[in-house]
């Protein structure tokens, strides 16, 4: 049974690492993790705006593209999207008419996650946008297609640290 197999594996990992901590520069590290990368993990500075952390750098995680959760496509009602964006970011002032002209991805990090996105009159961070709109990842594209807003996300989570899916291949 899958549950028993996973439980046994986790129990073995816990026992094998009992009393151990990870350190960098003689300090206990922050060890973030997430579900599935977009093919690369992210630099902590890009995702969280923290100063560079030597052990939280972008690395390839190509096995993540094999995950069933790697790619997700959703089509949103434009009026609902506009309402959600304006509720989360009132300064945006989005309208349903001509939505493609009001939304622009301004920057991406080296792992292709959105750094900043312009929503009408407001610029917001990719992670902030992801959380406000409940997107699976900040690695996304967004475009009006046939009267709906198509959002394609790659990966699940913030993308910093350990990919849980990728860890299965270690």
Sequence positions of predicted segments:
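Conserved, single-site charged/polar hotspot
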Residues: 1-170
């Amino acid at each position: 049974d899958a549950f028993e197999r996973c439980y046994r594996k986790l129990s073995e990992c816990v026992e094998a690492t009992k009393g151990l901590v990870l350190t960098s520069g003689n300090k206990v590290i922050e060890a973030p993790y997430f579900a599935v990368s977009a093919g690369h993990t992210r630099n902590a500075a890009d995702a969280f705006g923290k100063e560079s952390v030597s052990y939280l750098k972008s690395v390839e995680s190509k096995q993540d593209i094999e995950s069933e959760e790697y790619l997700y496509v959703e089509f949103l009602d434009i009026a609902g999207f506009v309402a959600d964006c304006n509720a989360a970011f009132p300064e945006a002032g989005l309208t349903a008419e001509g939505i493609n002209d009001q939304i622009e991805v301004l920057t991406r990090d080296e792992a292709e996650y959105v750094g900043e996105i312009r929503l009408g009159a407001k610029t917001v961070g990719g992670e902030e946008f992801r959380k406000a709109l409940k997107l699976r990842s900040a690695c996304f594209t967004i475009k009006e297609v046939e009267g709906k807003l198509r959002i394609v996300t790659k990966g699940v989570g913030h993308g910093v640290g350990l990919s849980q899916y990728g860890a299965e291949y270690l």
